[in-house]
Amino acid sequence: MLFSFQRALSCLVLGGALLLSLPTQAFCFNEAGARYKVDPLLLRSMATVESSLNPQAIGKNRDKKGRITSRDFGLMQINDRHIPELRALGILSNEQDLLNNPCLNVQIGAWILAKHLKQCGVNWQCLGSYNAGFADNNGPRRMIYARKVYAMYMKLKGGAV
């Protein structure tokens, strides 16, 4: 009986923490969108596809032999290849900053996306480069990612989520 009460209390506390974080998350997406001139709902859609809105998410990218080639961090799954530049700019000290500060993570994701859109234009292939990169042979992967983001965008826009 005590165990189930503790479990129920834990669920309520966790649920409350998640509810409290939703307005904060909305603020982060709105702020980043305004700063980098990107639709905040698009950023939220990308974060949902990238991490299921989990600020502690860590993704491991592997080669064909299963070796880890890079890691992605936080809501926007910022790839570790960006860390040296972000350190040099004084934006973060290490990858833990990407996990501990979700708003910073969203700002960095919006910055990366804005750089991509400036480089290759405002189109779905270019949006897909956020996840799949610019390599010529990654065109199909870019479009798969873009379709996922578009589907999530339409779902969020319709209020279904």
Please place each PLM-identified region on the residue numbering.
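Bacterial N-terminal signal peptides that target proteins for export
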Residues: 1-12
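N-terminal signal peptide c-region/cleavage motif recognized by signal peptidases
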Residues: 21-23
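Catalytic glycan-binding domains that act on GlcNAc-containing polysaccharides
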Residues: 27-161
